[in-house]
Amino acid sequence: MTARRVVATGTFDILHPGHVYYLTESRKLGDELWVIVARDENVKHKPRPILPEAQRLAMVSALRPVDHAILGDHTDMFCPIDDIRPAVITIGFNQYFDEEKLKGQLAERNLPAEVVRIGKYEDGDLASSRMIVQRIVEARGSGDQRIG
């Protein structure tokens, strides 16, 4: 029997509870969770990652829900998906994907994966890298050396 593979993608810069939630919920949708970590050069929709891609990959690989983690392709985001052949592709609540367009692109490549958007993590106010960076800047800028 073939394992039901799930693919989750993201930058995963400054890991936080929202990332863990996204990956945990993604893992529940199949037997294997494959995570494609964005390459530094391909992050164009937001500021460049603070952590280099190799470190982000190592951290994601160490997370309990993750069975396999790889770096994305340099030029074609669908190349790893072609290789993995997932049953499901998950996208985070705030990822900039047009779900219908993504479904069309998958169909064009004969990749019949279901696309599932994972909901927002609601158990804390520091569930995004942007909010964490903002909190650090505010704390350090005010002379307060405590983050929490």
Curated annotation (Swiss-Prot):
What PANTHER family has UniProt attached to this entry? FAD SYNTHASE (PTHR43793:SF1)
Protein name stated in the entry: FAD synthase
Family of the protein in this entry = Belongs to the archaeal FAD synthase family.
- What GO MF annotations does this protein's record show? ATP binding; FMN adenylyltransferase activity
The organism named in the record is Methanoregula boonei (strain DSM 21154 / JCM 14090 / 6A8)
Chain sites annotated for binding ATP: T11, F12, H16, P17, G18, H19, N94, Y121
Pathway assigned in UniProt: Cofactor biosynthesis; FAD biosynthesis; FAD from FMN: step 1/1
InterPro entries, per this entry?
Answer: Archaeal_FAD_synthase, Cyt_trans-like, FAD_synth_RibL, Rossmann-like_a/b/a_fold
One of the GO biological process terms: FAD biosynthetic process
Ordered alphabetically, the record's keywords are: ATP-binding, FAD, Flavoprotein, FMN, Nucleotide-binding, Nucleotidyltransferase, Transferase
General function of this protein: Catalyzes the transfer of the AMP portion of ATP to flavin mononucleotide (FMN) to produce flavin adenine dinucleotide (FAD) coenzyme.
Q: Does the keyword Nucleotide-binding apply?
A: yes
Which cofactor does this sequence's record say it needs?
a divalent metal cation
SUPFAM superfamilies per the UniProt record, alphabetical: Nucleotidylyl transferase
Is the keyword Flavoprotein in the record?
yes
Which gene holds the coding sequence for this protein?
ribL
Subunit structure, briefly? Answer: Homodimer.
